[in-house]
Design a protein with these regions (language model features):
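Arginine residue identity/basic-tract feature
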Residues: 11-13, 44, 58, 67, ...
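Short, contiguous, well-structured surface segments enriched in hydrophobic/aromatic residues
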Residues: 32-72
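Short, hydrophobic, well-ordered secondary-structure elements
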Residues: 61-103
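Long, amphipathic alpha-helical coiled-coil/dimerization segments that form elongated scaffolds
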Residues: 98-114
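Residue-level recognition of alpha-helical structural elements
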Residues: 54, 58, 77-80, 126
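Long, charged low-complexity segments
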Residues: 1-49, 110-230
Length: 230
């Protein structure tokens, strides 16, 4: 029985964080490096404002991605996986919309047709990895299948399944969510390289690459499959 939800929620989050650190000791180090990159962007764009409708639209999308990036990291450590997948789905749509804007402007087309429409994750607007994730995340967001409810299921003593209102660490699901989070981060970084090159005079990616290279080297030691390609 739950008597004080707030206290038990904090306790469950702490248990999750301890379990992640035990199984993957350098996860916090990886998240810290990702946060360092985000802070680098925040400081770099602190006094920048768009010079037109298109730039302002892009900057708003980028800021939205940054804010959710930091929140997702916290949810993953807490094993709050439904919340993670909903936010990660939103992040994929942001990357797709940024790609759509670039295609429209490069072809000298109006952005008017994009307004009021859900970003298209097809048509090469996101990587295949993100496109595949999006389908799964949409099933969770729309509650169109029952399988995703396993993210908050728990086995009870009488061999039945219940659903917990408290987050619980699962070595498969929590780490899969972390891998998706890192994949999304890399796709965002790739976009930001080209965006900053076009937006910031005399931009150099040296500081960016130092953080990313450190992340990759640390990641290769982490046993996380998302780093297997490096």
């Amino acid at each position: 029985m739950i008597e004080n939800y707030t206290k038990e929620l904090q306790r469950a989050r702490q248990v999750s964080q301890q379990a992640i650190e035990k199984e993957y000791p350098n996860v916090l180090e990886l998240l810290k490096l990702m946060d360092e990159y985000i802070v680098l962007l925040i400081n770099r764009f602190e006094n920048v404002s768009g010079i037109g409708e298109i730039d302002n639209y892009k900057l708003a999308l980028i800021v939205s991605f940054i804010r959710s990036q930091l929140i997702i990291s916290e949810h993953i450590l807490n094993s709050e996986l439904i919340e993670v997948t909903i936010l990660e789905r939103k992040q994929i749509e942001l990357i797709a919309r940024l790609s759509e804007i670039d295609k429209k402007t490069n072809n000298k087309e109006s952005l008017h047709k994009l307004k009021g429409k859900t970003p298209n994750v097809g048509n090469g607007n996101v990587s295949e990895n993100l496109k595949n994730m999006y389908g799964m995340f949409s099933e969770i967001a729309h509650s169109s299948k029952t399988e995703p409810f396993a993210l908050f299921a728990e086995n009870l003593d009488n061999d039945t399944i219940g659903y917990s209102v408290l987050p619980q660490y699962n070595s498969t699901n929590t780490i899969a969510a972390l891998g998706n989070h890192i994949q999304l981060f890399f796709d965002f970084v790739i976009y930001m390289f080209s965006f900053q090159q076009a937006f910031i005079p005399n931009y150099s990616n040296d500081d960016d690459m130092e953080i990313i290279n450190n992340l990759i080297e640390k990641g290769k030691l982490s046993k996380l499959s998302v780093f297997d390609r490096f």
